């Protein structure tokens, strides 16, 4: 049961991250997860590539 809760919470966090915009994204306010630019903050691990 505990593992199920952890998985659900992780999925919710990842889903929220993909719709989160960061001020440091290039271009400005780009969706971090789907961006090919490097974002900072919580979106950084989800950036596809950093230059």
From Swiss-Prot:
Secretion signal, residue range per the UniProt entry: 1-22
Which GO cellular component terms, listed alphabetically, does the Swiss-Prot or TrEMBL entry include?
Answer: extracellular region
- Predominant location: secreted
Gene Ontology molecular functions: toxin activity
Expressed, tissue-wise, as follows:
Expressed by the venom duct.
- Where are the coiled-coil regions? none
UniProt-annotated location(s): Secreted
Q: Which cysteines are joined by disulfide bonds?
A: 25-39, 32-43, 38-50
Q: Which UniProt keywords apply?
A: Disulfide bond, Knottin, Neurotoxin, Secreted, Signal, Toxin
The entry's free-text remark on domains says: The cysteine framework is VI/VII (C-C-CC-C-C).
Functional description taken from the UniProt entry = Probable neurotoxin.
Query: Belongs to which family?
Result: Belongs to the conotoxin O1 superfamily.
In Swiss-Prot or TrEMBL terms, this protein is called: Conotoxin Cal6.33
Tell me the organism: Californiconus californicus (California cone)
What does the record give as the organism's lineage? Eukaryota, Metazoa, Spiralia, Lophotrochozoa, Mollusca
